[in-house]
């Protein structure tokens, strides 16, 4: 099982002007804006890696070699979505036994996004997951994750917990101070 980013976030949890104030940088000078913007992105990526959480809205794809089967420890044959908080599932595709790529109807699975990490289970109507071809990455689940579904930057940024944003400010400050001399 692996997860990769399909669509990167379009907004970062920190505002450039706020970071410049934190760094005691001149707000009217743009000389270091590109560097600081890059450091903000790096801090978000590091926070996401450490926390195993998507901070800003992004599209992810999780691959599995087959659908899970019901067991004593996984009675619902749940697929655990690795990067919370999950907003929604955009598609589930799989390679069937004949080698054809099939898009699974959203009526055949149920997302339990209230649980963390979120789980995807076969719907009651489906009963179980379909059979797949015995191949690597035969199942692909695309989903959106992040603290906010808002396209408005201020709303999305405010949805990220303040402790995470504060850690990011400190991380950006540390990287900024330790950068190589130009």
Feature annotation, model-predicted:
Residues 1-182:
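Divalent metal-cofactor coordination and adjacent catalytic microenvironments
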């Amino acid at each position: 099982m692996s997860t990769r980013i399909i669509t990167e976030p379009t907004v970062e949890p920190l505002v450039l002007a706020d970071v410049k104030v934190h760094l005691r940088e001149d707000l009217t000078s743009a000389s270091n804006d590109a560097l600081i913007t890059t450091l903000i992105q790096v801090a978000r990526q590091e926070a996401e890696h450490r926390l195993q959480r998507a901070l800003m809205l992004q599209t992810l794809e999780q691959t599995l070699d087959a659908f899970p089967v019901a067991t004593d420890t996984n009675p619902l044959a749940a697929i655990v979505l690795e990067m919370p908080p999950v907003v929604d599932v955009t598609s589930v595709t799989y390679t069937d036994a004949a080698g054809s790529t099939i898009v699974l109807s959203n009526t055949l699975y149920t997302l339990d996004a209230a649980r963390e990490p979120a789980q995807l289970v076969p719907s009651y109507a489906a009963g179980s997951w379909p059979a797949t071809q015995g191949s690597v990455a035969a199942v692909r689940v695309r989903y959106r994750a992040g603290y906010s579904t808002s396209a408005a930057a201020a709303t999305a940024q405010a949805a990220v917990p303040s402790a995470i944003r504060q850690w990011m400010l400190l991380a950006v400050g540390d990287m900024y101070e330790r950068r190589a001399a130009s």
